[in-house]
Amino acid sequence: MRAFVLTGPGEFAVRDVPEPVAVPGEVVVDVERVGVCGTDLEFFTGDMAYLHQGHACYPMRLGHEWAGRVRAVGAGVDPGWVGRRVMGDTMLGCGSCRRCRRGQQHVCEKREEVGIRGGRAGALAERLAVPAGSLHALPDSVDPELGALVEPGGNALRAARATGAGPGDRVLVLGPGTIGLLVALFVRAAGAEVHLMGATEDSLAFARSLGFPHAWREDTLPDLPFDAVVDATNAVHLPALAQESVEPGGRLVYIGLAAEPSLIDTRALVLKDVTAVGILSASPGLDATIKAYAEKAVDPRPLVAATVALDAIGAVLAGERPAGAGPGPKIHVDPRLM
């Protein structure tokens, strides 16, 4: 089968690789759609921390935001999965440690991460092998495009819920990229007023096109009381800005990761009586995200700018915009395209 293989920083090829096998406890999926993520870009540039911590190494196969149809099942797996449309959890815990037993496999010390950590091959390929226990069934109303948006959506839904926001609340989301916009969509669906802060006029214009009129640059951000602030950026200085912007008694949600340590004055957290929350992984939010998409409470499809073939991934990771791409921040891949 064909797969996108990253062999080093900026070095890649689409290769014929051995077909995955459905070993006991696992399934093989025909991949229909995959999202290209900021994590994939960090592996492409060589900046991803896992490369320097021994959790990942080249060559590797990327892709963790995926949807597809089960092709085959291994021993011990319900054959009823065959033919079903699914997406899968990225985080694969050991299943036996204290964290896994508590349902926190996404922070298991020994976890694998599909297309990211521990050598587990990712979904930028025609087919993918994953544990059956990681599967989440997709209803007919959630098509492949939506299915590949469940994983980032799960992260965003958890961040939105962590704000505790509802009608009458005002929430500031820093960063109108894929995650920030998804957070904004879920917060709006909860009934709160949403403000977004971004760095470029294009990103802010796109946010406004989605029905978010309160879209600002850092130098135009109004002095308003924000009941919660979500930092969905990788900017080192913005965690502190989030802390400054939130109302006393409010909530800070950190879902972005900067390349360098950020500085937060914990005295301000205490004196403002602020609750700060970190969000890692979509795992606990996947089912609720599928439900939200199926019920059309949130429609993230405008975020997808283009869908390309495997052969175009390298150019996308190198920063090229596909011909005819829309204004959204997300690029999808359909491995069936030639």
Residue map of PLM features:
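C-terminal hydrophobic helical "lid"/dimerization subdomain
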Residues: 1, 240, 283-338
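Glycine-rich beta-strand-centered segment in the early N-terminal region that forms part
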Residues: 20-34, 49-98, 139-141
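Short glycine-/small-residue-rich Rossmann-like dinucleotide-binding loops
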Residues: 35, 74, 91, 233-234, ...
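NAD(P)H dinucleotide-binding glycine-rich loop of Rossmann-like/cofactor-binding domains
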Residues: 64, 94-174
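Mid-domain Rossmann-like dinucleotide-binding core that forms the NAD(H)/NADP(H) cofactor-binding site
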Residues: 81, 142-218
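Glycine-rich cofactor phosphate-binding loops and adjacent beta1-alpha1 units
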Residues: 163, 170, 195, 201, ...
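Short strand-turn motif at the edge of the Rossmann-like AdoMet-binding core
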Residues: 255-259, 279-282, 308
